[in-house]
Amino acid sequence: MEDSNASPRMSTEHENTEMHPFEYMFKHFKTQKVAISNAIRSTFPFLESLRDREFITGKMYEDLIDSCRSLVPVDKVIYKALDELEKKFDVTVLWELFNEVNMEKYPDLNPIRRSFECVFPNELSFQGIDRGNPNSQLSLEQGPSASYSQGSLNGSSLDLSSSEGWRSNDRRNSNLMQANQTENHQLAESPGHLDSCELQVQLNNGDATPESYSLLPQHEERAVQLNNEFQINPCFVQLIDVKKENSSFSLAGNQQTRARTNQNEDSEVIELSSGDSDDGENFSEATTTIPSQPAPAYSRTPPTLRTDRRGDTSDTESSIIIRRRKRTGRKKRERLGSYLIRNIKIPMKTSWKTAVLARSANTSSQRRRKRGPRIPREENADFGGAELPAVCGNVQGFLNKEKFKQGIYVRSIRSETGRLFTPMDFEIEGNCEKAKNWRQTIRCKGWTLRELIQKGVLQDPPRKKKENPRNPRQMKRQVNAL
């Protein structure tokens, strides 16, 4: 009875252990959402990458950007995007989250990525993953233990409630591995196949020593799928450094061959030297050109490549730009040289404070230009006559002193034509009515009437009109009317 009770307990525990990795991964992602949102300080390129890879829709992307424009904090916007990723969570979400671009842009994600690697060392492999292909191969070092994570590598959603799929995948993968090992062993024994074989080097997570390589016949041209095929053949390959997992090298006898990529721009030459294999044959060195890529921020071993660069001139270009800026600034200073502040020659290096103090200390700058009189005055003029010459604008006349004393409404000015004017009418006749100041506009021998009144030459006329004496006849009529 005890054995019968133990067997179902063992089966349930085995089922729970097979379901735990993805559940723990999902729970760990949920607990790290706040830390991830704090680590991502800007929306670009995180949201754009999620939209381009269809993790979020275009409408949701626009909503998130509009939230940022509405001054919503960036961490809250990123947290909302992580909520959407939680609904579609699988391993591809973690790959997209910790890709090379994000790790370079957001260095605060490094400790979070390391926490995932520490918790799930066999299920995750961020190192060397092809960003363009989410179905990239994992390291063969994981062996059959990575079978349950391979389903998520192909983008398929994991079923947390069933464990039969995991066990069936384990059995199928182990059988395929045994069949491929026997097939590769037969291929390795026949020397005729060596000329038409490709050496595929697969690296484990970021290490520089390959774990295994597989020899495939060239005429078969079949793709290696992670779910169903593993090619393992014992070999010793000595590498200087290789960045990518999926780099393949073709060997033809003892001659060197080159596998050229589609990109002909900035290239790096990586040397691969193979040691002696089990059958005693010595493979020659194979060189290949692969597109140069910057080392990821989270790489465990810094690359020690011997490179031959042709197009990478960023340092020289930046130094040239700096020299150009210095040269243009020097030319600008030479062109300006010195400048003048109120006839004071001050060099360019003099501070503004010194320039202002020097300007204030100069007495010539404090002098104001005095405007001279527009109409010249007669300094020794004689104002003793009964009439004085009067000028207003283009009109000339004569001012009678006696009539001028009687008041401003008395016609005291006679023009050259013989017409009589009051001072205000004479101002209007001279087209100076806008001034409305006849004491200032009418002049006698260059002196204004105001100045002559102040000097006592003329008497200030009263402002009231002189009342005319009433006609006695009119007064008599008014009395009779009463």
Swiss-Prot record:
Residues 322-334 have a biased composition (Basic residues). A motif (Nuclear localization signal) lies at residues 309-326. It comes from Mus caroli (Ryukyu mouse). Residues 131-171, 250-334, 357-382, 457-482 are annotated as: Disordered. One of its GO terms (molecular function) is DNA-binding transcription factor activity, RNA polymerase II-specific. This is Nuclear autoantigen Sp-100. Residues 133-148, 250-264 have a biased composition (Polar residues). Homodimer. Interacts with members of the HP1 family of nonhistone chromosomal protein, such as CBX5 and CBX3 via the PxVxL motif. Interacts with ETS1; the interaction is direct and modulates ETS1 transcriptional activity. Interacts with the MRN complex which is composed of two heterodimers RAD50/MRE11 associated with a single NBN; recruits the complex to PML-related bodies. Interacts with HIPK2; positively regulates TP53-dependent transcription. Interacts with CASP8AP2; may negatively regulate CASP8AP2 export from the nucleus to the cytoplasm. GO terms for cellular component: cytoplasm; PML body.
